[in-house]
Design a protein with these regions (language model features):
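Short beta-strand segments that buttress and anchor functional surface loops
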Residues: 73-81
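Short acidic/polar mixed-charge low-complexity motifs
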Residues: 37, 82-86, 99
């Protein structure tokens, strides 16, 4: 289910697992956060690599997940390098075949 894929996504992100993340992404995925905007799978993967290379560790704690059809609203606490905590809301949309087509991240 897409709900399980959301949990996998945050696990793979916390583990900096580019290959597994790539498997979840649609070819035409878009990613927008407070620093970057990327379109298509290769560019989104590169954006993730850049994030992972800029930190020693990154850990995603899920506070709450709500869903409406193929869209998930995820309240998160992201801990960088074991100490810096950021409140984030991700809005993640899936396509009809269960691939992530859009990620929008908002910093709280």
């Amino acid at each position: 289910s897409n709900h399980i894929k959301i949990l996998e996504y945050f696990n793979y992100f916390s583990n900096k697992d580019i290959n597994q993340l790539s498997n979840l992404f649609d070819d035409d995925i878009t990613l927008v956060d407070w620093n970057i905007s990327a379109t298509n799978k290769n560019n989104v993967i590169q954006a993730n690599k850049d994030i992972f290379n800029s930190v020693q560790t990154i850990n995603v704690e899920i506070v709450n997940i709500s869903e409406k059809e193929k869209t998930f609203f995820c309240q998160l606490i992201i801990t960088i390098n074991g100490s810096e905590k950021i409140d984030v809301v991700d809005i993640i949309e899936f396509n009809n075949v269960g691939k992530i087509k859009s990620i929008k991240a908002y910093k709280g």
